[in-house]
Amino acid sequence: MSNEVSIKELIEKAKVAQKKLEAYSQEQVDVLVKALGKVVYDNAEMFAKEAVEETEMGVYEDKVAKCHLKSGAIWNHIKDKKTVGIIKEEPERALVYVAKPKGVVAATTPITNPVVTPMCNAMAAIKGRNTIIVAPHPKAKKVSAHTVELMNAELKKLGAPENIIQIVEAPSREAAKELMESADVVIATGGAGRVKAAYSSGRPAYGVGPGNSQVIVDKGYDYNKAAQDIITGRKYDNGIICSSEQSVIAPAEDYDKVIAAFVENGAFYVEDEETVEKFRSTLFKDGKINSKIIGKSVQIIADLAGVKVPEGTKVIVLKGKGAGEKDVLCKEKMCPVLVALKYDTFEEAVEIAMANYMYEGAGHTAGIHSDNDENIRYAGTVLPISRLVVNQPATTAGGSFNNGFNPTTTLGCGSWGRNSISENLTYEHLINVSRIGYFNKEAKVPSYEEIWG
């Protein structure tokens, strides 16, 4: 069967199922959405094992934690939200808001997150009474298919319409392209090629941009805590989280203290240029990331570079030779490796981060470890980012119980990253909202003198 026929059939089935799902009440919808998250929560260990084995990326324990945290955080965030019928009324404006589904959602998912991304997108889609078709990464299709299979098994127990979640069984660029061109709305999480294809599909699309989180350590902050938080984020799942830390920008006068804090907390620091170059040439080939190091452990990366590191090393920190295009290490490194850079003034720290974003990753995420709110707000105002994560691992930009970012696996990067949104994607992006506007007898109509005076 050709991709054309199979995609066409998936779309037709999804449309039929969507019309049935559209008749569901809020209570019925929420029962289904909760079940999807609970399936991943309950099977976290199995899914984590399958993901590591198939993709050969990441860390089993971190993938278990990710399944638990994301499923719980997403359900906790959306469980009380209205998405069916009248969702809000504003008597003072004489407006009534009515939620309606967008239809069939096409969702491409990355090799780096083959379980939680399908779950997240399915929960958001069905919360809005949409159906969804997942286009998995070809090298993660088995675990993604198993995730969809178990979610569907749970939906069947609940008597849900058949085919509200489907998956492309033979994923390819051609199949993904056709799917995106046939759906009502597209979520593109993955490489730049897929995101570009989504925005070229002729359909409303939500894509993501490349990560390259710059992290500023403010002078006088608790360097030990900063090191702990940054290492926690950088080593998580062997560094494949899109918002995880990439560069540490530290005060020059306390640089040695900052590095000492990193070493004390399990980092291996490299400052001699010859050894740094061994890692540089291992991580990047012709200016592009070496696919062989993505999601690999510190030990594997060190072995590839021909460098011995102490057993138990959590991350590798390399001394950079300059910001932006001066050093390819200032690009995104999807493994537990950081580049360290010095600054004299806080304004210079922000300039260094800016140079690195102009090199790669504009619009995504930054981190700052500081007690100075003026500096925090300055960085948040000046940098071309959608999220500034304060005094916590940058990996929490995707939402956690300790911050206000909406929990998601799709992080919009705004126009900087050539995306349509500069926030975390949620169910709200997958509903249409109609507005009923009554004649407002109580409205005060200002005179032109009042307006222009």
UniProtKB/Swiss-Prot annotation:
Catalytic reaction(s) noted: succinate semialdehyde + NADP(+) + CoA = succinyl-CoA + NADPH + H(+)
SUPFAM superfamilies: ALDH-like
The EC number(s) this enzyme carries: 1.2.1.76
InterPro entries, A to Z: Ald_DH/histidinol_DH, Ald_DH_C, Ald_DH_N, Aldehyde_DH_dom
GO molecular function annotations of the record: oxidoreductase activity, acting on the aldehyde or oxo group of donors, NAD or NADP as acceptor
Active site: 242
pH-linked activity: Optimum pH is 7.0 for the reduction reaction and 8.5 for the oxidation reaction.
Binding residue positions for NADP(+): 188-193
Oligomer status and interactors: Homodimer.
PANTHER family linked to this entry: ALDEHYDE DEHYDROGENASE-RELATED
Described purpose of this protein according to its UniProt entry: Catalyzes the reduction of succinate semialdehyde to succinyl-CoA. The enzyme is specific for succinate semialdehyde and succinyl-CoA, and only shows low activity with palmitoyl-CoA. There is no activity with NAD(+) as cosubstrate.
Protein name: Succinate-semialdehyde dehydrogenase (acetylating)
Naturally occurring in which organism (per UniProt): Clostridium kluyveri (strain ATCC 8527 / DSM 555 / NBRC 12016 / NCIMB 10680 / K1)
Lineage: Bacteria, Bacillati, Bacillota, Clostridia, Eubacteriales
Gene: sucD
